Curated annotation (Swiss-Prot):
Quaternary structure annotation from Swiss-Prot or TrEMBL: Monomer.
Chief site of localization: cytoplasm
Species this protein is from: Ehrlichia ruminantium (strain Gardel)
Reactions the enzyme catalyzes: tRNA(Glu) + L-glutamate + ATP = L-glutamyl-tRNA(Glu) + AMP + diphosphate
Lineage, highest ranks first: Bacteria, Pseudomonadati, Pseudomonadota, Alphaproteobacteria, Rickettsiales
Keyword Nucleotide-binding: yes
Motif 'HIGH' region location, chain numbering: 11-21
GO BP terms, alphabetized: glutamyl-tRNA aminoacylation
A Gene Ontology molecular function term of the record: ATP binding
Compartment(s) where it occurs, according to its Swiss-Prot or TrEMBL record: Cytoplasm
Family of this protein: Belongs to the class-I aminoacyl-tRNA synthetase family. Glutamate--tRNA ligase type 1 subfamily.
Name by which UniProt lists this protein: Glutamate--tRNA ligase 2
Amino acid sequence: MLNHVVTRFAPSPTGHLHLGGARTALFNWLYAKHNNGKFLLRIEDTDSKRSSKELIDSIINSMIWLNIQHDGEIILQSSRISRHIEIANQLILNDKAYYCYCSEEEINLEKEQYTKKGLHYKHNCIWKNRKPPTGNCSKVIRLHSDTEGITEFKDKVYGTIAVNNVQLDDMVLLRSNNTPTYLLSVVVDDYDMGITHIIRGTDHLTNTARQLLIYNALGWKPPEFAHIPLIHDENGNKLSKRHHALGIHEYKNAGILPEALVNYLLRMGWSHGNDELITIDEAIRWFSIDKVGQSPAGLDSKKLEFLNNHYINTTNNATIIEMIIPIIEKTIGYKVNTEKIGYLLNGINELKKRTKNLVNLANESLFYVEDIPISFDQESLIIIKSNHDILSILYDNLSKVLNDDWNNSTLTSMIKNIVKDYNTKIHNIYHCLRASIIGRINAPSIIDIMVNFQREECLNRIKYARDMVK
């Protein structure tokens, strides 16, 4: 266990929290918890045109839902702009940065010339060693970057990473409108927040090399870095919040449990032997960066379904019902009768066994809690319309069964007698019972459901179905 570990998650509120961001947050959180450290949350909201409070709230709510809890107050990067400007000016005073007065047109022309020659573009500012022009000229602050040698760091996933300095230009630190760039703001914030370890995607590798130049210019000790492989979709294409990636809120709305999604994210690039089902306590105890692989992680919808089914079945029934009742009420358009929740509580175990998600479970549970008239699927309607006589026979015979005798044995015997007395087929009887009582043909044991509903509810439903086709 390491001493004094501080990690962070620093999302940009230009979109909802997606899988890649959630996994980054999870890995940083687990690393901090494993080492008894702190996990901080910083919202990088300096892009005022694309950031919004709605998206900030969405990110925070998604993290709360996933139970990835940050320590301390949330830091808004926009509240620290004056500090970023202060550091940019400090670099000027220490001759580690300079004012660039090149116009946008001049820079674009320079880029074109490099492109024509097939060279990697690196801005060569003519003002680097000149006196500033007279008058009120637009300017930016650029870092004095090394033009020779390499920038090297040890990554906790990929080992030693070396970037040729010829690829790193004199990056802009402060724009002409006096706003800091991402590269400067991140370095200053991470340093001031005491961040010791940064875990993020491999798409930041070049950013890391650039940020190390800023750390060196300031004489600050950089944090340790771990770059985790990106997530690919099921076709092997890179996932991003602009392409194919669902937001965490969409997984929630689709009926995925947070425990299932966390387990799913955990196994995207990290492993602990052959373990697939991992509790959060086990994850905290076992998590280490050296178990993160270097190959991209891929989406696997079947695995997510498996995990979700597992966590639905291991969550107590009362909690699951509390989750699905709002979905049911939205579907049927009225408040569920408390008495009928008892039917659902008695019958939900069978439904849980084969469900993929809470939305599916809610739809499969409708017949338990619906008032008459219940909803019928198309197949049930066809059966009801063509079996009026059978429904009448079922109603008349079941009406003779007393409440105290309404049990599995009595009902099974009666159905056998009806088949014998009326020369019909048993599967036709069961189809009629399912169609009239639950409105569908595919369901758990109809006898068990009838015992659960008891006599009055079953007779009322059969009577309604029979009378539909009088």
